[in-house]
């Protein structure tokens, strides 16, 4: 995580904790000429627009005080949505038995992408059952090789 994102997280996390919300992710991204600071929050049952607005207002106030980002940016606060990213240990543990999408930094057994059910997670290895054509295959993916992971919608 970059130094700027660490500073932003230090500002945001006490706010989300105070409001009994989970800080899911923070992203600082450039799109075209504009920069966006995106904060994703959640709680059991999901968050509503009023909770997003409350976090946005409090974060904006604190960011103006400490000013860790020097350039102009747009602040966005939202739910992570149905395809929530899996980043923290707890995210992976909560995703066991759910449908997930995982990509790796390098090929593992000839693959860099898996989409299937997360059967287990022991802190170091993800075990995913995928369907390859008509047969089910169980794959083991070392956590340190995972580039990105998220919940997925199964069609």
Swiss-Prot record:
GO terms for cellular component: cytosol. It is found in: Cytoplasm. The keyword Cytoplasm applies. Its main location: cytoplasm. PANTHER family: RIBOSOME MATURATION FACTOR RIMP. Required for maturation of 30S ribosomal subunits. This is Ribosome maturation factor RimP. It comes from Listeria welshimeri serovar 6b (strain ATCC 35897 / DSM 20650 / CCUG 15529 / CIP 8149 / NCTC 11857 / SLCC 5334 / V8). The gene is rimP.
């Amino acid at each position: 995580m970059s130094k700027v994102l660490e500073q932003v997280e230090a500002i945001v996390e006490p706010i989300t904790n105070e409001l009994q919300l989970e800080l899911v992710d923070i992203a600082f991204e450039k799109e075209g000429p504009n920069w966006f600071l995106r904060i994703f929050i959640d709680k059991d049952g999901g968050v509503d627009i009023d909770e997003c607005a409350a976090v946005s207002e409090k974060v904006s106030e604190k960011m103006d005080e400490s000013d860790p980002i020097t350039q102009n940016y747009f602040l966005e606060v939202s739910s992570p949505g149905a395809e929530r990213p899996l980043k923290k240990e707890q995210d992976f543990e909560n995703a066991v038995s759910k449908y997930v999408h995982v990509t790796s930094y390098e090929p593992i057994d000839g693959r860099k992408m898996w989409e299937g059910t997360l059967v287990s997670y022991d802190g170091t290895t993800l075990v995913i059952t995928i369907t390859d054509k008509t047969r089910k295959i169980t794959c083991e993916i070392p956590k340190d090789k995972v580039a990105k992971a998220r919940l997925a919608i199964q069609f």
